[in-house]
Amino acid sequence: MKKIAEAWPIVKGDYTVGNPESRIAVVTLASQINSLPEAALWGSSKTENLGVEKIIINTISNSNIRYILICGKESRGHLAGHSLLAIHANGIDEKGRIVGSEGAIPFIENISREAVKRFQQQVVLLDRIGLTNLEEIMKIVREYKDQGEVYPEEPLVAISQKKRQSTFTIPHSGDIIVSEEFVMDSAAGVVCTTNDF
């Protein structure tokens, strides 16, 4: 069985790659804490939406990761750590809102409910929000880095291919005069020369 997706980690972020075979990843929230090579991934997450999405995507694309240590100081207003705990415990509603999150904008837009469910099943979250002592963090990483079995399913690559669609509207009227040479079609939001009409 394949354990790690090709080109893992799938999405870029503010993290360091350590041992991809490790059972633990470390999220330092808004704190910058020196990384240990024993963790699969080690990095910060300051937002309750894109930051949480990146953690989920990079976790479920490596079946070796079974624990996530959440440590460091919370980011004010965004509450990325609280939101990570909430999505793990409660998931998302039909609008993509993280159920139970108190973050400013707790909406997940780029991954599916299936990806969230896989995340909930694959990992155990170790809630040590506020912990910044490197020795204590090292002790936890060393305790969990080899603990447990690989998740019994192949990695899940859950990245949205959703691209912003550009829209082009042909102007129909020059209903706002900008100057003698230019008019604007307010419905299309396009500025044209008066010769175009």
Swiss-Prot record:
Extract the GO molecular function terms from the UniProt entry: methyltransferase activity
What Pfam families does the entry give?
MtrA
UniProt entry keywords in alphabetical sequence: Methyltransferase, Transferase
| Biological processes annotated in GO | methylation
Per the record, the domain of life is: Archaea
Q: What Enzyme Commission number(s) does the record list for this chain?
A: 2.1.1.-
Checking InterPro entries in the record gives: MeTrfase_MtrA/MtxA
**What does the subunit section of this Swiss-Prot or TrEMBL entry state?**
May be part of a complex composed of 3 subunits; MtxA, MtxH and MtxX.
What family is reported?
Belongs to the MtrA family.
Q: What's the protein called, per UniProt? A: Putative methyltransferase Mtx subunit A
Native organism is: Methanosarcina barkeri (strain Fusaro / DSM 804)
